[in-house]
Amino acid sequence: MNLKTLIGLEIHVELSTKTKMFCGCKNEFGQIPNTNVCPICLGHPGALPHMNKQALRYAIMAGLAFDCDIANEFKMDRKKYFYPDLVKGYQITQEDQPLCTNGYIELKTSTKNKKVRIRRIHIEEDTGKSIHNESGNTLMDYNRAGVPLIEIVSEPDMSNPDEAREFLETLRERIKYLEISDVKMSEGSLRCDVNINVYDEDSDFKTKISEIKNLNSFKSVSKALIYEQERHMQLAKENKIGEKETRRWDEDTQTTIVMRHKEEGNDYRFSVEGDIPKTYVEQSYIEEIKKNLPELPEMRKERFMNEYKIDEYDADILTRNGYLADYYEKVVEISNDPVQSSNWLLGDVLRQVNENEIEIEEMNMSAENLAKLIKLSSAKKINNQTAKKVLREMFNENFDPEVYVKEKGLLQVDDDNLLQQIVDEVVAENPESIESIRNGKDRAIGFLVGQCMKKSKGKGNPQKFNELIKEKI
């Protein structure tokens, strides 16, 4: 058998509108349960929904950002099923006339650039939230019921978990660029379900599709897909097709667990939402939105390469995160050194971000202070070792590095007579190293430079020490 994997994603994104999708209730995370509710989002008889125009605009922005076709007219539908978080007994969504269709995301880190098609992006309302307390009871919070969502459905074009993760990360960053959602998986504003099965390229054999829910982090998406891929491969090797089912990822056991047999579309008994009339979207409105879209990662990457003369790899990393790209441009504006700004950000700064286990947006250090540090280093007012030490201190404290290095006496010594005196002392104290250098062992120069730096208490210029040692010998 020549087994291949098929992976598709269904991604829900909560939109950052001020109010809910079909009523005037506030759209706010973390409020007292059941305070942001009204007869409309609770489904009381006679309460009529009305479309949130800002949510519609945000959905069109998303569609355009993923190169989708935007419908000029659409209707809303009722998706009917019984579950405690669905207080009305149905969800207002779109079944057969989605707002956006035929988009794509291009993956960059595959062996070659690969387009993953986006089948559709449709608008809908979110459901309530189940809260399980310590007593074993389940309580319902309907603050989330009616919050505007877009559901982004990909085609099953991904062939391994790495591609699926890259697709999800690329999608999240593009949504963040649009500023239509904070896309925080930890708060549920970005949620992902995955569909996976395997097939044999040499026959018509294929396993039945599994849908995995309860994926609340990029790590859980990757782990669930790796597990399911192995499970489906094993089924195929045993010539079994498995069951079409919905599963969930269990963090404790690091496995997927069956929740229920997967429902077919007609189980939901879709019907037209009669309380919301068909909506018409003028092409001029779509064009106006398109014209005002922010600069997206791909466009910004090209600009960074052309304007700042940095290489493609650095430009790609810098522009994947909108906050990082903005931060970089602020640093460049002050430091007037695009290359060194890129080197510091992608090197020592991101290293501190990773070591502190935070997001780049949570960093305290201002762009202004980082730029000042870069200028101090580039002007040789402090050496590289001192600059790195100051950065580690400044990362969390966010102080002015110019003031700090003066107060701490860290400015680099530029008195040639003093530097020569230190070199003379070190050379006199290390005759064996001098002999090694004269015998062709250049590594000993590094040792002598280190001794000079030690005597200067880190304030000397290592390049200058290197030159003076060679002249002395």
Curated annotation (Swiss-Prot):
Entry GO MF terms: asparaginyl-tRNA synthase (glutamine-hydrolyzing) activity; ATP binding; glutaminyl-tRNA synthase (glutamine-hydrolyzing) activity
Catalyzed reactions per annotation: L-glutamyl-tRNA(Gln) + L-glutamine + ATP + H2O = L-glutaminyl-tRNA(Gln) + L-glutamate + ADP + phosphate + H(+); L-aspartyl-tRNA(Asn) + L-glutamine + ATP + H2O = L-asparaginyl-tRNA(Asn) + L-glutamate + ADP + phosphate + 2 H(+)
EC annotation from Swiss-Prot or TrEMBL: 6.3.5.-
Broad EC category: ligase
Cited Pfam families: GatB_N (PF02934), GatB_Yqey (PF02637)
Keyword Protein transport included in the entry's annotation: no
One Gene Ontology biological process: glutaminyl-tRNAGln biosynthesis via transamidation
Entry keywords, A to Z: ATP-binding, Ligase, Nucleotide-binding, Protein biosynthesis
Annotated InterPro entries: Asn/Gln-tRNA_amidoTrfase_suB/E, Asn/Gln-tRNA_Trfase_suB/E_cat, Asn/Gln_amidotransferase, Asn/Gln_tRNA_amidoTrase-B-like, GatB, GatB_C_1, GatB_Yqey_C_2, Gln-tRNA_amidoTrfase_suB_CS
Function per UniProt: Allows the formation of correctly charged Asn-tRNA(Asn) or Gln-tRNA(Gln) through the transamidation of misacylated Asp-tRNA(Asn) or Glu-tRNA(Gln) in organisms which lack either or both of asparaginyl-tRNA or glutaminyl-tRNA synthetases. The reaction takes place in the presence of glutamine and ATP through an activated phospho-Asp-tRNA(Asn) or phospho-Glu-tRNA(Gln).
Subunit-structure text: Heterotrimer of A, B and C subunits.
Xref: HAMAP family: GatB
Family per similarity comment: Belongs to the GatB/GatE family. GatB subfamily.
Record-given protein name: Aspartyl/glutamyl-tRNA(Asn/Gln) amidotransferase subunit B
Lineage: Bacteria, Bacillati, Bacillota, Tissierellia, Tissierellales
Gene from which this protein is expressed: gatB
